[in-house]
Amino acid sequence: MKKILLILTVAVAFHNVSAQEITLDKIYSGYYRGKGIAGIASMKNGENYLVIEPTGIAKYSYKTSQKEENIVDGKFESYEFSDDESKILLLTDSQPIYRHSFLGKFEVKDLKSGKTISLNEGKTVQEPRFSPDATKVAFITENNLFYQDLSSGKITQITNDGKKNSIINGLADWVYEEEFGHARQYEWTKNSDAIVFVKSDESQVPEIYIPIYGKKLYPEEMRYKYPKAGEKNSIVSAQLYRLDTGKTMPINLSSFKNYYIPNVIQTAKPDEIVLVTSERIQNASDVLKVNTKTGAVQKLFTETDDKWIDTDSPTLEFLEDDSFLWASERDGNRHLYWYDKDGKLKKQITKGNWEVTDYYGFNPKSKEVYIQTTEKGSINKVVSKVNIENGKSQLISNPEGNNSANFSKNYNYFIETSSTASKPHTYVLKEGNGKTVKELQNNNEQLQKLKADNFVTKEFITIPNDAGDQMNAWIMKPKNFDPNKKYPLFMFQYSGPGSQQVANSWDNGNALWFNHLVQKGYIVACVDGRGTGYKGTKFKKVTYMNLGKYEIEDQITAAKWFGSQSYIDKTRIGMFGWSFGGYMTSLAMTKGADVFKAGIAVAPVTNWRYYDSVYTERFMRTPQENPDGYDKNSPTEYANLLKGKFLLIHGTADDNVHFQNSMEFSEALIQNKKQFEFMAYPDKNHGIYGGQTRPQLYQKMTDFILNNL
């Protein structure tokens, strides 16, 4: 009894001490954790949707919003239906590999018979995919492509030449996965009689090795192929496998732009696959139709740009008459275009000084497309429907904040996920016209906890740069802000091409830490300068061939602007960034040494020659073509300028931005007799997490700020 009372006393004391404060302990204990709805998917009848719950995969009614049943009981990480919804693919155990790839154990359950079959005899596979007729599942293991007959259980091996760090079939290599945004590089035809896949020969790509220290007597090594800027990439080819013959034939792409094959797309036609291909410099992209009976290739059209095309996420949908929709930045903003079946432009569907940021689908009945846009300002994302024939548009989401949608198959309903900078995520069931049916989930409890601990929200402003642009920015001020006082300023940014940090959306990540710093007496701010997204291509692509130049100029300009405000102590301005943001912080502490007193760079690129080919060359061309662009924007070249307090942080097992970057920068600082702090995280990747890593990391950064800014 005495022991229980002691525990209660301690708990009450802790509560009283921290009740009005956002602490790191509370942040990392999950005290402020919000709620969500996992695995939302519409069923083909348009009347029901599914979600993942602790007890299984639950079926709900759109009309009543009530749960009807569990279609599968048990605990699953993810699921995928066959096209006819007779079977379901269940992921039961996964092991992450890189950004998107993972090994997993999968089961297929027949929902009519209740029979369950293990994929690949219960062994791990990658990227399984139902055939459209639901009789088979294709998958990859050890870089080879297979398919399994779901009636007999028979496994057929399609390729035999797969080999680690040499040949990959149907799966992205490291750089494709990282920069084109997906791991699967194969697709079934709609009639299920053929598979088109990409074969990657990475045997000539330079190999990177990373020591893994672990707890063994001798460190192990992680070796994989990583093409750096200007170096050899995988040689890729498109392959056609026909199930009736059991034979594979190469698809001849020699007449087209074929250096990269980022996308393999299934269409509604039974004997057709579409490939999106690109040149190495990524300023021209072909859209190609492949006849899977003959192997013949037809070019629909070529998209070009005088700088680059974002080939990582093309919007392409074929309609019933074989015409198609395509998103392009050709008029200075990302908009939707409609082409006929021969690749001739019919019309531009959306227009204006705003951008289409996501595409949800097309309703053939109403002739409407459903899209997410920045129509209500570049810091907001809203959902609209647009008639492709007459151009009539209707807003169907909240008019501000960050809104996304998950539609029923017939577009009669959708589940809206929305937030603002001051309101956490809410999930609302709506009719297709935007009328609310029911709020499914809110995070009022999370918000009340934060408000009780004096949470402050972001104030949105604009700041001019030297080019005459108005840069989006936010600022967080202490609750008891006194305009007559001078506050130290802590700036955060990312600044990468097409990115956005100044958004009217809820942030469950760094925003809580920033609140912690605000409560310590700091003002925190963020500025999206030139190169960032959602303000048109002129603003985004001005950085071409000079990545880092205009971005750091704008951050320095913004810091000076803040320093000119009466409430900012211009002698106490600091910066923090991760990855590209760490690169910018490194430039701020060197090229901006007279402005910034302290900086924290986490996992920074310090020389673009060390980063991967697809990303870097998209914005910079190769080092051979553009040596000045690479060298004049490397913080290593300006190590002699460092004046302030600098904390450099990197995970030793970073497969993305290699530890080498921080080592080279450190050596340059050392040889210039510069004092700085360095923190290496053993065996941690680009995210630097696991166990108590994040709490320790953020305490380290907090202490550095308190002691040096």
Language model region names:
Residues 30, 93-98, 102-105, 158-186, ...:
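Predominantly five- to eight-bladed beta-propeller fold
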Residues 100-146, 154-184:
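Asp-box/WD-like beta-propeller blade repeats and closely related beta-sheet repeat scaffolds
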Residues 62-65, 110-114, 150-153, 242-246, ...:
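Short loop/turn segments that connect beta-strands within beta-propeller blades
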Residues 207, 262, 270, 404-709:
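Serine-hydrolase catalytic core recognition
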Residues 199-346:
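Beta-propeller domains
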Residues 1-22, 709:
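Bacterial Sec-dependent N-terminal signal peptides
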Residues 50-55, 81, 88-100, 137-144, ...:
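Beta-strand C-termini and the immediately following turn/loop, strongest in propeller blades
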